[in-house]
Amino acid sequence: MSSVLKAYERFTLTQELQDQSEEGTIPPTTLKPVIRVFILTSNNPELRSRLLLFCLRIVLSNGARDSHRFGALLTMFSLPSATMLNHVKLADQSPEADIERVEIDGFEEGSFRLIPNARSGMSRGEINAYAALAEDLPDTLNHATPFVDSEVEGTAWDEIETFLDMCYSVLMQAWIVTCKCMTAPDQPAASIEKRLQKYRQQGRINPRYLLQPEARRIIQNVIRKGMVVRHFLTFELQLARAQSLVSNRYYAMVGDVGKYIENCGMGGFFLTLKYALGTRWPTLALAAFSGELTKLKSLMALYQTLGEQARYLALLESPHLMDFAAANYPLLYSYAMGIGYVLDVNMRNYAFSRSYMNKTYFQLGMETARKQQGAVDMRMAEDLGLTQAERTEMANTLAKLTTANRGADTRGGVNPFSSVTGTTQVPAAATGDTLESYMAADRLRQRYADAGTHDDEMPPLEEEEEDDTSAGPRTGPTLEQVALDIQNAAVGAPIHTDDLNAALGDLDI
């Protein structure tokens, strides 16, 4: 029997890896569009600024084809490079399109008519067509300009610093909308605004060069549709990761925003590793977890085998992303979410409810977390030289704090900023500490939260923890009032979905 079990473990470990092709294998050739990328051999800031504005207008143009938009975006992302011709070669690595480079010498005075290099081979008709596309902006853009400030395009770009300021500001906004272009393209505007505010505070985005929301939405859709563009951006992210601490400003910004893109769509996998395996609590010894533990072991091996590009499976539209779905290990996932719900306040922004969520193991995770919060890691205690009395004192102190504050916070944590004036705290034991009550609260948060609540999305970083709401006035009951009503209604009776919907009926969201 033991030989069969060992064979099963080996089979599970190799099953994830057997479909992997050899490194560098070229996929079968398919029909590919020709994408025209414009190249400047001059570092003149006036020419580069004009080309950036021209390409931005092509991306937003009503009449532009997808190949026009993809080429314009690739040109924009290559403009910070001192040698555009070499930098565009990154796009040649994509099997999705053929890249045609067109060298240009400038623009006709007062227009967007290209002056192509003699070697480019562009006809007069093509030049006129591109100029017409640049002028054909959507009616949804105010003042017929992509920028919030209608006077930006009339600026004199006579210094390289001025050009770089605009270029970095525009490209950073394109990177920001790339973050969730595959996993949550309909993310609320507030989520984007938070990141914009962060980079504005850091001085990486000049407020004068802010794009209109409609312009950012169109750019996001183009990036979502263009695999060749996403391939190019992935190569840029890898370049940014390879930089030393002393890097240029652009790749420092790309590396920073890349942290939002890495492992997108794999939140369930990494949270399961963090809370189910990282805690190393005795509950993992349950026989029901054995098969799924082997599955997680094989997935960790697969992730390492995929190499650097494993971080960007969603951006690359890789089928391997499905292997990491939490539906492949539902019991461990349910158990981990129960632990995370108790331990981590950030989990309030993570929509973990799934059709395969197991109620029993979710409750098991919550109970395990509450009982084990005072447990001591023996190896760490030995490294610190703690005596048995000190270990016991630590465990007892945490147990007292947890018990005393159970009514103040549903996860057993302490909220030092909560106001208790005029508010009666209902003990957790009296509220029916059931999965239904937690799920009801989770569904309520999913409706109410404005960002970071999409499927398979990692909990937001520290700067995005606030649950911002729309600026308009609210007439209905607040979230706290509804939550308190639900909590009070739970005394003596479990919460049902119909009751929750009735409670939410007047909530102004």
UniProtKB/Swiss-Prot annotation:
Residues 1-404 are annotated as: Ncore. InterPro entries: Paramyx_ncap. Keywords: Capsid protein, Helical capsid protein, Host cytoplasm, Ribonucleoprotein, RNA-binding, Viral nucleoprotein, Virion. Its main location: virion. Pfam families: Paramyxo_ncap (PF00973). Residues 405-509 are annotated as: Ntail. GO terms for cellular component: helical viral capsid; host cell cytoplasm; ribonucleoprotein complex; viral nucleocapsid. The keyword Transmembrane does not apply. Coiled coil: none annotated. Residues 458-469 have a biased composition (Acidic residues). It is found in: Virion; Host cytoplasm. RNA binds at residues 180, 195, 260, 350, 354. GO terms for molecular function: RNA binding; structural molecule activity. The keyword Ribonucleoprotein applies. Residues 452-477 are annotated as: Disordered. Ncore is globular and carries the regions required for self-assembly and RNA-binding. Ntail is an intrinsically disordered monomeric domain in the C-terminus. Belongs to the paramyxoviruses nucleocapsid family. Homomultimer; forms the nucleocapsid. Binds to the viral genomic RNA. N0 interacts with the phosphoprotein (via N-terminus); this interaction allows P to chaperon N0 to avoid N polymerization before encapsidation. Interacts as N-RNA template with the phosphoprotein (via C-terminus); this interaction positions the polymerase on the template. Forms the helical nucleocapsid (NC), protecting the genome from nucleases. The encapsidated genomic RNA serves as template for transcription and replication; encapsidation by N is coupled to RNA synthesis. Forms the encapsidation complex with the phosphoprotein protein P. Before encapsidation, the newly synthesized free N protein, so-called N0, is chaperoned by P. This is Nucleoprotein.
